[in-house]
Amino acid sequence: MNDTKQQPLLIVEDSDEDFAALTRIITKISTSNPIYRCEDGEEALDFLYREGLYADKTAPRPSLIVLDLNLPGTDGREVLTALKKDRDLQTIPVVILSTSSNPKDINACYRQGVSGYIIKPMDTQRLNKLVENFLSYWFEAVELPSSTIIS
């Protein structure tokens, strides 16, 4: 069994408030998961492809990606498309956390192979509960792919 307490988590989120809420919940559930943040799609692709500021080949491969769809510049839809087309990255589970409740977005994301789609509620307590349940599932119930690079 993988030690999910050590698995890196990539959060692609432009909202400081939403990122702060996510990290607060994550540290409540698991204090030792490394958390990486990218604020837009271009930064996320650089992180995943180890380009630009992330050109260090020892940069960790995330075992789980939490992706917002509505990002500045390259949006989450484009990040998801690139990720799922890449043989080395397509096995990383991606969970969408977005304000979009549009059935077209939800269906398109599932067609591209997301592992889950969570609509961000406006209520903070509801958001906390949803994220806590989702993270408990990912960190406690399932086996995540190894964070080591498979080439």
Regions found by a protein language model. Name each.
Residues D56-P60, K84-T91, Q112:
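Conserved phosphotransfer cores of two-component systems
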Residues P72, N102:
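The feature encodes the CheY-like receiver
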Residues M1-L10, S15-Y36, E42-L45, Y49, ...:
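Non-catalytic signal-transmission and effector/linker regions of two-component phosphorelay proteins
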Residues K120:
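A Lys-centered signature of the CheY-like receiver
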Residues S115:
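Short, glycine/charged-rich "phosphate-handling" switch motifs in NTP-dependent
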Residues L67-D68, S98:
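Active-site residues of response regulator receiver
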